[in-house]
Amino acid sequence: MRIPDRELIEQVIEAGRYAPSGGNSQTTHFIVITDAGILSELESLVQAEFAKMETVPGMYPSLRNSVEASKRGNYSFHYRAPVLIVTANQKGYGNALVDSACALENMMVAANALDLGSCWINQLHWLDEDAEVRAFMEKLGVGENETITGGLILGYSADGLPARTPLKRTGNPVTWI
């Protein structure tokens, strides 16, 4: 698996750093993981922690899928991509998720412009209060006063970026006044 050049990764991160933030707070923290051993260790930990969970009626479908795949023992939350960028932000900050979402979207747009594949990854956010995952992420630089807000994987698509037909939007209603 080919890791994108560091310069390309830095360009993607820089796009995230220039995303809007509430009151121009600029508090989104980016943790960039390219070490294959760390990614493998984190993958095993995430699978083990999801496997401990029970599914419940009404559970968010992606979370349910994560739990079920983990119980089967074949779950890679980061799809074995060579780069994982985790975002974190201050606990108690009212715009933590929104600011990080803006940064993640900017990074996805930049990745596309650089012919890199990307995918939004929420699993570490879902496991932010899991003691094992939390301890591991703190060793990687997430602060005790921070909450994990999201993530993004980067890499090269096996067959290049796919040509996509725009999907018809049926949700996200618009109300005009």
Q: Language-model features: where?
A:
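Solvent-exposed alpha-helices and their adjacent loops that cap or buttress functional pockets
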Residues: 22-25, 76-79, 140-146, 166-167
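C-terminal helix-cap and adjacent tail motif
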Residues: 71-72, 142-177
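Small-aliphatic-rich amphipathic alpha-helix that forms the alpha element of a beta-alpha
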Residues: 16, 85, 90-136
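Short, solvent-exposed amphipathic alpha-helical segments in soluble enzyme
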Residues: 47-48, 101-104, 168-169
